[in-house]
Amino acid sequence: MELLLNKLSTFGNALPGDITQGLIWGIMAIGVFITYKILDFADLTVDGTLGLGGVTAVVLISNGVPVPVAMLIAFLAGCMAGLCTALLNTMLGIPGILAGILTQLALYSVYLDINGKANAPISVDKFPLVISSRYVTAGNEVVDIICTVGTALLFVVLIIAALYWFFGTEYGMAIRATGCNSSMSKAEGINTKRTTIVALVLSNGFVGLAGALLAQYQGFADVNMGRGAIVIGLAAVIIGMVLGEVILRKRFNFIGKLSFTVIGAIVYFVVLRIVMLIGLSTDNTKMFSAIIVALFLAVPYIQKTSKTSFRKAGKRAANAAIDEAEHLGAALANSVNSPKKEGK
């Protein structure tokens, strides 16, 4: 009993940090949502873009650049990474997955060129960082915890509001149409290459911004901080889509999808914390992430096949009932006609 209470206490103390981390990674997941769900483009650039945004912000802040300006430049650095992938795909005809891998590999070298070493630390004691994990650990004032979580939430709300507005415009609808049916979009006169470029630029811009926030939150940027980011992003998107469809059903609109993508990231980190408290080694977190993605990816397929099976079973039962009714009808008709024949 005491062990259980200790674990619950540990979970409660870690929960604000997990929520904050989920909100930050949720911004990255929104970037993945733009390419994966809206554009239908498998973009692997994000593993490199996250680290690029982080190191850009850390190096600039360390050299006296105001934090908001450093974060804006990190966003633009992410946009440039997305532009590279987009140009490789649209102008050179390189498949999307390969284009993302090539850019991702190049970004590791860019990271080292910017920082000169694999790790770039930054302290909240020396610089006025926007967010820091120091304020969400056990022992801090409730006000500090609320302000830290609220800061991350404010970024999320502003980004969702901006994207909801943008994808409701004519150009945003053109991007969505490109993802739905590229051939039909071309027939309607939409420049699909341009919409692909804009979507990838926007997506990686938000990933770069998430990297800047994450580096400030954890107190450092690392060349490997983005490794496996695409898995976490996909996990957040898939978890969010499944939860949204279950909870909202027919009311699951575009803004709901954006919101539940972030909720999916929070759920991911909370579940990860629970599993770690149970006793899973931190060395197995990547494997656990892959299992989560696989399970949630399988949910729509299982639902579809189960519905199909139920439909087939229903049809078989209906056909059997019809056959039985016809058989009974024929039997009754024979029994009615038999006395008449005997009377004659």
Where are each of the predicted segments found?
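Membrane-interfacial amphipathic/re-entrant helices at transmembrane-helix boundaries
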Residues: M1-M28, T56, N63-V69, E141-I145, ...
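Cytosolic-side transmembrane-helix boundaries in multi-pass membrane proteins
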Residues: T10, C180-A187, N191-R194, I247, ...
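Alpha-helical transmembrane segments within multi-pass membrane transporters and channels
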Residues: V32, V65-L105, V110, V156-V157, ...
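Short, non-helical or kinked segments that cap or interrupt transmembrane helices
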Residues: T35-G53, L88-L102, Y171-A174, V198, ...
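Membrane-embedded helix boundary and interhelical linker motif in transport proteins
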Residues: Y36-M91, G139-V142, V246-K250, L277
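Helix-loop-helix "hairpin" substructures at the membrane interface of multi-pass membrane proteins
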Residues: A81, I145-I230, L234-A235
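Transmembrane helix-bundle core of multi-pass membrane transporters
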Residues: G96, G100-G168, V198, D222-V223, ...
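Transmembrane alpha-helical segments in multi-pass inner-membrane proteins
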Residues: N204-V207, G211-M287
